[in-house]
A protein has these predicted regions:
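Short carbohydrate-recognition loop motifs
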Residues: 594-618
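Binuclear metal-dependent phosphoesterase catalytic core
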Residues: 381-393, 897-943
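His/acidic metal-ligating clusters that form di-metal
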Residues: 776-777, 826-902
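Divalent metal-dependent phosphoesterase catalytic cores across multiple superfamilies
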Residues: 724-805, 867-885
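Extracellular beta-strand ligand-recognition surfaces/modules
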Residues: 636-638, 676-717, 721
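Secreted extracellular polysaccharide-interacting domains
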Residues: 610-635, 657-665
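Gly/Ser/Thr/Pro-rich low-complexity, intrinsically disordered segments
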Residues: 22-566, 572
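Extracellular carbohydrate-recognition regions
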Residues: 561-588, 720-740
Length: 943
């Protein structure tokens, strides 16, 4: 291909890592995006994770010195009708806009509280000499003068009526008719054609008609008149009619002087202003909090805010919104000032906030504007006016192209489709006909059909899109075949005689997920009543089955449950039970109970007393009728009503061959009230089976305790007991770092072992068990990391670190270990400062090859705040892209290990001694072996 033109540019997708150097400690992380919506106007969105939660900040950065930019007020045609900001932007042709002035929520037909000026003309406003609003309430006005200089001051305004340049009197307002008219009102044709509607409400008014600066008519009382296009009328209350009619006879040259003034005595004509929009109090002056009087609504509350601000030493202003929803925390005045200082603000003032806060802008390359923020209450409020941003330029010729792929990762034979957007030299959108776009390859191999690329060889492909002589390029990474397959969902529930759809992804060498074409996947099923074609599942009668997807020699399984996933087996409405029997230290009883009840009309209550003993104390219930467990069950569920007694709860399961299993429902009844608990059924149990007993026990009792526990609504969850790759992810199966076993290190190699809980409330380990576990964990290991707060006193040689639900970091050779507390549901909720400390440590880790982060929860699946978990993941992905480091997130929990690979980040769960059978030997740990820059791992049993 011939050499490409200078206009060819590759699209680079960026993810903001955050402003680590921020002086505001409350900001933990930032996700920032920017796009130019027209030359001179940039939309910035910044999602800030603070110690209070997330803040969603939208900023319209406007360069007033750019000749392409116009700022104008927006309102409805009548000035009284309320509209949402999106409608105002659409109707006025603006490219963006925010809400502006306050208004009377209790009235449906009233103007804004402040003045409104456009192009040197007062559209409407109250005379400050007679109004109780405006400067008398410390409510400021945002102005831009004819030299494009912005200001935010407590502007007063007066409206004077003059005859032959001699003052006759002052008008109470312009283009506003108050409920009671006590002074003259000036009305022009901006909003009214006649005075008929006004006279109908105020029948005693007199009217002077002024056209081309001359009085042309004096009306009778209550007479309606037309308002001249080149003039105005003066409505006069009956008490002042004689005075004004005498002073302003027909033929008199009349002028209306509209002047702004400040308390400093400075005055200027309205004609000197391009724009003026009222708002609330001044927020900042000279980069600091304003210390004078200022009207502010709920300054101490975290609410939605709209602000206009100027930027230090620049021609820029900012239109800023901060949202308040269930997902975003809003902001108070003190923190708002701190936020604005981040953006180098000089002066700032409030616009209306709360439910009125709205930010609308078109996206880059798009003609239609759209809502960009999340209004309080879930939908836009209709407001009285706004500030609109306009492009002064007409749509020009195409100058820039943006190419958007369905994916930047692909496999040979898979399709990638593209769309393009265009803008002119002023970054205004230019519509593009897809038929006018041609696609070609600057490097790599493949062929196009329209906008769809089919790569034919692995490697990097540089795609070039050309339209009207403008080119843009984008690189696509193509691999021959996936390293593994991922089916979503991995466990599918489907109703009988219905269909559902799988999505299958190929995992490439980077760990990225690439969607695969359904027609290229071969499916098989181990159940004749379940079939899959082109990723669509069809199911007939109730059953469970496994389906296998095959693609280019790679395969993966998914589970299908046809019919209900959870089935009630005994709600204990008729099944009775008896106490298991007293001992020297344990006494109790079992009875039916009608309160509390979770389901139906009764539950079973077991009351028991544990007396002090160093031996295990056990209380149990024997069901009169054993509870049947179906062949397709994978877990047994029950609702328990606890009293925070802290005892372990188990059930006894007897399989069809008579073998007994003791399955743990909960390690500790550390809850009060009803809670859903569940026990997985071991793979080796032969079903069908039956539940015969319910147990609670304590391994050690220091003080006598009498308590009770209630049982209700026993159910099963249908599925697969061997859940590897189905109930739990097993991405290690295609991970090149994973080995089935690891030899002990030699030479400069070293090993790090990481284990979950080594202590369990349900399990009393003797010294032999602890010694055996210590030996297993310590064998060949330079470092042992205990990734749980539940630990036995292990006898370990060498270096050991213990997760303590607080921030810690250690470096061993070329591996950095970072422990972050997450026990309260996430990093922020547990120890907010750990965010900045972890980021600072990670970004100063150029001397290590491996970063291992230990926490108690998987950020992507277990954080209470899913956005926080995703943000942490995205941050790690960006670090990996920049540095190429190996990054692992290891967390403790579950009854079995799990490995997830997400965009090159490995999330590994270690269950420690926790296992379905409650035998520590069935537990496991993660063994890592470092060999120079290479790292390998395996999952090893504790036995």
């Amino acid at each position: 291909m011939k050499k490409m033109s200078k206009k060819l540019a590759a699209i680079v997708l960026l993810m903001g890592i955050g402003w680590i150097s921020s002086i505001h400690a409350s900001i933990l992380h930032s996700i920032k995006s920017e796009e130019i919506i027209t030359k001179g106007a940039t939309h910035i969105n910044e999602k800030l994770l603070t110690d209070k939660g997330w803040r969603n900040v939208n900023i319209l950065k406007i360069d007033l010195a750019d000749s392409n930019i116009l700022l104008k007020p927006m309102e409805s045609a009548t000035g009284l009708e309320r509209q949402n900001i999106l409608q105002m932007v659409q109707d006025s042709g603006a490219v963006a806009g925010v809400n502006a002035d306050y208004f009377d929520m209790g009235s449906s037909n009233s103007p804004s509280l402040g003045m409104l000026i456009e192009d040197g003309k007062l559209l409407h406003g109250y005379n400050s000499n007679f109004s109780s609003l405006g400067i008398k309430k410390n409510m400021a006005t945002f102005m831009i003068d004819q030299s494009n200089l912005p200001s935010m001051e407590y502007y007063g305004i007066n409206v004077q009526i003059k005859a032959n340049d001699v003052l006759v009197g002052e008008a109470e307002a312009k283009n506003i008719v108050p409920t009671s008219v006590k002074r003259p009102i000036v009305l022009d044709s901006t909003y009214y054609e006649t005075t008929s509607d006004i006279i109908a409400k105020h029948p005693t008014l007199y009217t002077l008609v002024v056209e081309n600066g001359e009085v042309t008519y004096q009306s009778y009382s209550g007479e309606s008149v037309s308002i001249p296009k080149e003039g105005y009328v003066i409505l006069i209350p009956e008490a002042d009619a004689n005075l004004y009619y005498a002073a302003l006879p027909i033929g008199t040259i009349v002028s209306i002087d509209e002047n702004l003034y400040l308390n400093s005595g400075l005055t200027t004509a309205v004609a000197n202003m391009k724009l003026g929009v009222g708002g609330s109090g001044i927020l900042m002056k000279n980069g600091e909090a304003y210390t004078g009087d200022a009207h502010a609504v709920t300054p101490k509350a975290d609410v939605a805010r709209t602000v206009v601000a100027s930027v230090k030493e620049s021609n820029e202003i900012l239109l800023v919104t901060v949202d308040k929803t269930s997902d975003y925390v809003g902001i108070n005045q003190t923190e708002l000032i701190e936020l604005l200082q981040r953006y180098n603000v000089q002066d700032a003032m409030y616009f209306d906030g709360g439910g009125s806060t709205t930010f609308v802008a078109r996206n880059e390359g798009e003609l239609a504007p759209s809502l960009q923020n999340y209004p309080t209450g879930g939908e836009q409020r209709k407001v009285i006016n706004g500030v609109g941003v306009y492009s002064a330029s007409q749509m020009g010729n195409l100058a820039n192209l943006k190419i958007i792929p369905t994916s930047t990762e692909a496999f040979v034979g898979e399709k990638v489709s593209f769309t393009v957007k265009g803008t002119d030299e002023n970054n205004n959108p230019v519509p593009i006909d897809s038929n006018d776009v041609t696609y070609s390859l600057a490097s790599g191999e493949g062929h196009f059909s329209g906008n769809i690329l089919s790569p034919t060889k692995a490697g990097n492909i540089l795609v070039v899109a050309t339209c009207q002589g403008v080119e843009v390029g984008l690189e696509i990474n193509v691999e021959e075949a996936p390293k593994g397959l991922q089916i979503e969902p991995s466990l599918l529930q489907i109703d009988e005689n219905s269909t559902k759809t799988f999505q299958v992804y190929g995992i490439n060498s980077k760990g990225s997920k690439v969607p695969l074409s359904g027609d290229k996947i071969t499916w098989t099923s181990n159940q004749s009543s379940i079939s899959v074609s082109n990723n669509t599942v069809s199911a007939q009668g109730e059953c469970i089955g496994k389906v296998t997807a095959q693609y280019k020699g790679i395969q993966s399984e998914a589970g299908v449950v046809v019919g209900k996933a959870t089935i009630a087996v005994d709600s204990l409405e008729t099944n009775s039970a008896k106490w298991g029997g007293d001992t020297n230290t344990v006494t109790g009883s079992v009875c039916a109970c009608d309160d509390p009840v979770y389901h139906g009309s009764r539950s079973l209550k077991m009351t028991y007393t544990f007396n002090p003993s160093s031996n295990k104390q056990v209380a149990y219930t024997v069901f009169d009728t054993p509870i049947p467990i179906r062949e397709d069950a994978r877990s047994i569920n029950m609702w328990l009503y606890g009293k925070e007694q802290g005892h372990t709860a188990k059930i006894e399961l007897v399989d069809s061959e008579g073998k007994t299993y003791y399955l743990k429902l909960t390690d500790s009844i550390n809850f009060s009230g009803w809670k859903f608990v569940s026990a997985s059924i071991p793979d080796e149990a032969v079903l069908p089976a039956k539940v015969t007993k319910f147990y609670t026990y304590a391994n050690l009792v220091n003080e006598k305790i009498t308590t009770s526990v209630y049982m209700d609504h026993i159910s099963i969850t249908r599925g697969f007991r061997n859940g590897i790759g189905i109930a739990t992810r097993a991405d290690y199966l295609f991970d090149p770092y994973y080995k089935e076993s690891l030899q002990l290190p030699t030479g400069n190699q070293y090993m790090i072992n990481i284990v979950g809980a080594t202590r369990s409330d349900s399990m009393l380990l003797n010294s032999e068990s602890i010694d055996a576990m210590s030996k297993k964990l310590g064998e060949g290991a330079s470092v042992v990391v205990k990734a749980s707060t539940k630990n036995s006193q292990l006898s370990l040689n060498g270096t050991q670190y213990t997760y303590a639900n607080t921030y810690q970091e250690e470096t061993y050779k070329n591996t950095k270990l970072i422990m972050i507390g997450t026990d309260s549901g996430g990093i922020r909720a547990t120890e907010a400062s750990a965010w900045s400390r972890a980021k600072a440590s990670i970004e100063n880790s150029s001397n290590v090859k491996n970063i291992m982060i230990v926490m108690s929860l998987n950020p992507l699946t277990q954080f209470s705040d899913a956005k926080e978990g995703k943000a942490f993941h995205d941050y790690l992905v960006e670090i990996k892209k920049q540095t190429g480091q190996n990054i692992f997130v290891i967390y403790a929990g579950g009854k079995e290990p799990e490995v997830r690979m997400e965009e090159g980040i490995r999330y590994i769960r270690t269950n420690g001694i926790d296992a379905t059978t409650d035998s520590y030997q069935e537990g496991s740990f993660i063994k890592f072996k470092m060999d120079s820059d290479a790292v390998y791992y395996t999952i090893e049993k504790l036995k």
